[in-house]
From Swiss-Prot:
Pfam families tied to this protein: fn3, Kelch_1
Alphabetized CDD domains for the sequence: FN3 (cd00063)
Source organism, top-level taxon: Archaea
Organism whose genome encodes this protein: Saccharolobus solfataricus (strain ATCC 35092 / DSM 1617 / JCM 11322 / P2) (Sulfolobus solfataricus)
Protein name: Kelch domain-containing protein SSO1033
Length: 725
């Protein structure tokens, strides 16, 4: 289905309404030095119009259009290939290349105006966003990492075409697929030719609504969101033309023209420059509503609507031929009776000419051909010559380059840098003598040191090496080295130095369960060596030649250590010493109690990382030491026992046990043990954690067994004597 038929006839319909409003304007101008060539490059796979065209990865992409509206064709090296199809049909879309991919916006189809933003992802299209205030054929360009989408037609209804098109200035941000409306056009236009020249959007003519067109040129500056209107530039109204901008000249190609009393498809190529408009060429196939894209000094037109108001299949190429831009001399040196010049290559140039002269009435020129360096010979030593380079092609000559003044055998060539070595707040420079001494013996070298535009120091040396001291680290200095002979100084060898100093180390030490983690940074680049010593001063680990900021984990047991960090660079060696107390807080001990014969036997398990234990009985300290059992005297009463493990990292939570004791060493029948049963409880207490019995615990068990036997004997005797139990 051809959705574009409405658009083909819209210009003619609107033209009939606008004839009474048109006023003629006549412009006359002389042509600058350029020419325009237009050629029929190839045929599209089929006739089409209202397509979008981009230049992507060295190929032309023809997107959508009035025919086969979801198809994409790729033209490369004279061959057509089918590209990735659009997910839906699009007539009059706009497309742009950004960040090495293609974005397609706007357009319409049988369902209405397309609001979706398509992005080429590999070999398929994906929808990444929706356009606010959707429109087709908007003006689209990239500036400052945003895609500007301006104006466009906002209706597909033939009746609605009478009203003004969209005037919104929309910004799309590809980094997060978001939109923002930042303003509005002073004159809403649709179908005007447009081009973005890198700093400004230029729109020529276009439909403004109410059956009216404009013959103005609108210029939009995205830098400040401002518009400039050049009123009445065109002698007629023109719709759906193609635009290009090159070397300060605006080219208007094709389009549908409305003049006083008539209209038709334009075959002219117009140039607007210096406030003047002039026809400079003709299209092989007159068209309007063609897709187009500018690539350098070339403009490609794909398809369009021809003179019979039907689609055409022409792919046309318009080439804008200008004289080259002036070259820039990039290198120069004086030799013995000679001067060597080098310059940058200039696009569109077919050759170069050197013009040179002196102040004694001599002048000459040399056509050196298509090269970018040349040695002029036959000069006289001691005489100053002036040189400039021009580029040329079939259109004409460029402006001359900047003038370079050189005197053969007058002063030396500049020295040649060998090395720069940074020390502690100093820098040592080494260089070679110049390749040409100027024809005289070298007297020495001037070395000038500047900080921005301020003189820091100056030196005159007879050697090819110099150490510059008392420099401030991290400050940029410019150093100029001149070779000197009796006629003067060479041009300088210029270099930039940023002095350094010995690196400071900033360390962060973290105590982990599996070792000591050391993180560090340095104030200047340096090689790092880590050394870890035990309390006896013995080196137990060394990690050498670590470059850059990093970290390292020492897997060592808990204890006291000395960490040494050594930072070395060309400025010297820095050493930093850290005392590391590597302990983790201990766990709470498990306490066992036995009361027997006015003695309280207290024991506990050994906890890892404990250096000493504190034992409290009824909040009185009765023991401090490394043992895991003690014996203390008690009398009748209740006893609260706390055992606390201690190391340099801190104290554990207390292990707590309670016993209520009655009786004495002889009479134990009234003894009551709280939390600890007699033999079986003791056995479980000493063996439940899987540890071997200590000597103290073994003695306690033996004594307890004896006392149990003694108690049984006493009980038996008392019962036989009639005592109460």
């Amino acid at each position: 289905m051809k959705y574009g038929n409405m658009k083909k006839w819209a210009p003619l319909i609107l033209f009939l309404f606008s004839l009474l409003l048109l006023q003629g304007i006549s412009l006359h101008a002389s042509s600058p030095s350029f020419s325009v060539n237009a050629s029929y490059l190839a045929s599209l796979p089929y006739a089409n119009s209202h397509v979008a065209v981009v230049y992507y990865q060295g190929s032309l992409y023809i997107i959508g259009g009035d025919s086969h509206s979801n198809q994409v064709w790729i033209y490369s090296n004279g061959t057509w290939n089918i590209g990735p199809s659009l997910p839906f049909s699009l007539v009059s879309p706009s497309a742009i290349v950004y960040n090495n991919t293609i974005y397609v916006m706007g357009g319409y189809n049988s369902t209405g105006i397309n609001p979706y933003v398509l992005k080429l992802n590999g070999n398929s299209w994906v929808v990444v966003s929706e356009m606010p205030l959707p429109a087709y054929s908007p003006y689209i360009f990239v500036y400052n990492n945003a895609i500007y989408v301006i104006g466009g037609e906002n209706t597909t209804s033939p009746a609605g075409l009478y009203f003004p098109p969209s005037n919104a200035i929309r910004l799309f941000y590809p980094n997060n697929d978001s939109w923002r409306i930042i303003g509005y056009m002073p004159v809403p236009t649709y179908g005007g030719g447009y081009v973005f020249n890198g700093t400004s959007l230029i729109i020529v003519s276009g439909y403004i609504g109410y059956s009216a067109y404009t013959n103005d040129i609108l210029i939009y500056s995205p830098q400040n969101n401002n518009w400039t209107i050049l009123n009445g530039v065109l002698p007629y109204w023109i719709h759906d033309s193609a635009l290009a901008y090159y070397r300060g000249v605006l080219f208007i190609v094709g389009g549908y023209i409305y003049t006083a009393g008539s209209g038709g498809v334009n075959n002219a190529i117009l140039a607007y420059y210096n406030g003047n408009l002039q026809r400079v060429g003709y299209l092989p196939v007159p068209v309007y509503s063609a897709g187009y894209v500018q690539v350098g000094n070339m403009l490609y037109l794909a398809g369009g609507i021809g003179s019979s108001l039907s689609d055409v299949s022409a792919l046309q190429l318009i080439t804008f031929n200008f004289p080259p831009l002036p070259p820039k001399i990039t290198s120069y040196s004086a030799g013995n009776e000679s001067v060597t010049l080098g310059w940058n290559p200039v696009r569109l140039s077919s050759g170069y000419e050197i013009i040179y002269w002196n102040n004694m009435g001599f002048n000459s020129s040399i056509n050196v051909g298509n090269v970018t360096s040349y040695t002029v010979t036959g000069l006289k030593d001691g005489i100053t010559y002036y040189f400039e380079v021009l580029a040329y092609n079939s259109i004409g000559y460029s402006s001359p380059s900047s003038i370079i003044a050189l005197t053969p055998a007058s002063v030396p060539n500049p020295p040649q840098l060998v090395s720069v070595k940074y020390g502690n707040d100093n820098v040592t420079l080494n260089w070679l003598p110049p390749t040409f001494s100027g024809g005289y013996l070298l007297l020495g070298y001037y070395v000038i040191v500047k900080n921005e535009n301020s003189m820091v120091s100056s030196h005159f040396v007879n050697s090819t090496s110099l150490t510059i001291s008392n420099l401030t680290p991290n400050v940029t200095y410019n150093v100029f080295i001149y070779a000197v002979n009796k006629l003067g100084n060479s041009s300088p060898l210029v270099l930039t130095v940023v002095p350094i100093t010995k690196a400071s180390v900033f360390a962060f030490i973290t105590k982990l369960g599996n070792g000591i983690l050391v993180n560090w940074t340095t104030s200047f680049p340096a090689n790092i060596t880590l050394e870890l010593y035990n309390p006896n001063g013995n080196l137990i680990s060394q990690i050498a030649a670590i470059k850059g900021n990093s970290s390292y984990l020492f897997r060592v047991p808990q204890g006291n250590y000395t960490l040494v960090i050594i930072a070395s660079n060309s400025a010297g060696v820095s050493k930093y010493v850290y005392q590391v107390v590597y302990y983790l807080p201990p766990a709470s001990p498990q306490v066992s109690l036995i009361g027997f014969g006015n003695n309280l036997y207290i024991s506990w398990n050994n906890e890892a990382n404990v250096i000493t234990y504190l034992v409290y009985v009824n909040n009185s300290l009765v023991y401090e030491g490394p043992s895991n059992s003690i014996v203390t005297n008690i009398s009748n009463g209740t006893y609260l026992v706390k055992v606390i493990g201690v190391n340099p990292a801190g104290s554990s939570s207390p292990g707590i046990a309670v016993i209520h004791y009655t009786g004495d060493y002889v009479t134990v029948v009234k003894m009551k043990v709280v939390n600890v049963t007699i033999v079986s409880k003791i056995a479980s207490a000493v063996s439940g954690n899987g540890n071997n019995l200590s000597l103290g615990q073994s003695i306690v068990i033996i004594l307890l067994a004896v006392m149990i036997l003694l108690s049984i004997a006493i009980i038996t005797r008392n019962r036989s004597n009639g005592f109460d139990w």
